[in-house]
Design a protein with these regions (language model features):
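Conserved SAM/SAH-binding beta-strand->alpha-helix loop
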Residues: 225
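Core catalytic lobe of class I
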Residues: 1-222
Length: 225
């Protein structure tokens, strides 16, 4: 099957497909042409949770996460804008946030400059494991689903058995930021087709890459570590 115009232009760039690559998220996104991605999975290394909790002992209790490069809110907002640019019409952004981002409305600020992205769903990940917390202990993270205009579900979201509260044990040995593998693969299969391009600018342990390999999707992504 011949490459589409977007895929052909992508082949001319210095970007690795379907394999890990060491690259800053901003640089990676800037190299991707407009309107070629069906899905962008974005798991930023934000500090909202750590800053709210302020235990003062990050380096001893969460040393692996503590060592990860941190992203400012401005960088996250810019990368959401870049996601909007590279997404094709009706493509999706899957943005991971924590409860403090949801409670403070920070998740809306991340999308404030991306006027073509509409929030269409929210999935709670129940990690089945008690975490930190000065009050209620953290057992969840949230996956914000935004869709680029025009928004529609019929024919675009094909798996209607995904619950909005997803129970799946975390796998910290894989990567300190590892996200639920089964949910990731289900989501990729739900909103993309075989051969579509899935982008992950903060790939971490490359769980999205693995899900793309299992489902026959093309992966573009990288990380600094």
């Amino acid at each position: 099957m011949p490459a589409t115009r977007g895929q052909a232009s992508l082949l001319s760039l210095d970007l690795v497909r379907n394999a890990p690559q060491r690259m800053d998220a901003v640089e990676l996104m800037s190299r991707i042409p407009d309107k070629i991605a069906a899905l962008v999975c974005f798991d930023p290394q934000y500090r909202t949770g750590l800053d709210k909790l302020k235990f003062g002992n990050e380096g001893s209790r969460q040393i692996a996460r503590y060592r990860l490069p941190q992203m400012t809110d401005d960088v996250i907002t810019f990368l959401v804008e870049e996601a909007q640019r590279i997404l094709r019409p009706s493509g999706h952004l899957a943005l991971w946030v924590d409860k403090f981002a949801i409670g403070s409305g920070q998740h809306l600020k991340y999308l404030r400059r991306s006027r073509q992205l509409r929030i269409v769903d929210l999935i709670c990940w129940n990690k089945l494991d008690i975490g930190m917390g000065r009050r209620a202990r953290c057992v969840s993270e949230y996956l914000l689903i935004a869709q680029k205009d025009p928004t529609k579900a019929k024919g675009v979201w094909t798996d209607h058995r995904i619950p909005d509260c997803w129970p799946e044990s975390r796998n910290p040995g894989r990567h300190p930021h590892a996200k639920p593998h089964q949910l990731t693969e289900r989501l990729i299969r739900a909103v993309t087709k075989k051969g579509d391009i899935v982008v992950d600018p903060c790939a971490g342990g490359y769980g999205v890459l693995e899900a793309c390999q299992l489902s026959g999707r093309n992966f573009i992504g990288g990380d600094l570590l």
